[in-house]
């Protein structure tokens, strides 16, 4: 029961902090990045129907100040992905499905001793860039992340 009350307080405090952020200027994109309710909801929920594990939420809540700091100081992004997704939109008082391009940018850094990735999202050509997610230190094993050549001199294991 005590863990639940601590979780509730942490979530409430984080939500207040997140809401008070509003937007921050990003040198990497040379524009403001907005911290909308969609981004906070994505920290709590994986999708519309499933909540993230509590331990994952707590870690993301605690890393949020680092994510904001990273957006403020990073001058480059390391990842980019563009997809097309369907969204429900209102058109002449009716709900219709509309396909829009969705762009994701990943800013990766070790900041204050923690490796994190901040994901910025933009929907459509006219959408505003907004915070989408924070990914704590992770392990990659996807094909696109395979290292084909090294740019490092020497052996990092031995040096």
Language-model segments: what does each one mean?
Residues 1-159:
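Ribonuclease/tRNase effector modules and their secretory precursors
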């Amino acid at each position: 029961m005590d863990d639940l009350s601590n979780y509730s307080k942490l979530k409430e405090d984080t939500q207040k902090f997140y809401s008070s952020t509003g937007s921050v200027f990003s040198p990497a994109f040379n524009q403001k990045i907005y911290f909308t309710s969609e981004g906070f909801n994505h920290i709590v929920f994986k999708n519309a129907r499933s909540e993230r594990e509590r331990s994952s939420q707590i870690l993301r809540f605690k890393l949020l100040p680092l994510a904001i700091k990273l957006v403020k100081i990073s001058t480059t992004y390391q990842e980019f992905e563009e997809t097309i997704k369907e969204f429900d939109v209102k058109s002449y008082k009716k709900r219709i499905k509309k396909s829009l391009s969705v762009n994701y940018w990943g800013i990766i850094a070790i900041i204050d001793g923690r490796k994190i990735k901040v994901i910025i999202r933009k929907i459509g050509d006219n959408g505003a860039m907004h915070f989408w997610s924070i990914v704590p230190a992770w392990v990659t094993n996807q094909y696109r992340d395979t290292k084909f050549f090294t740019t490092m001199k020497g052996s990092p294991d031995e040096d």
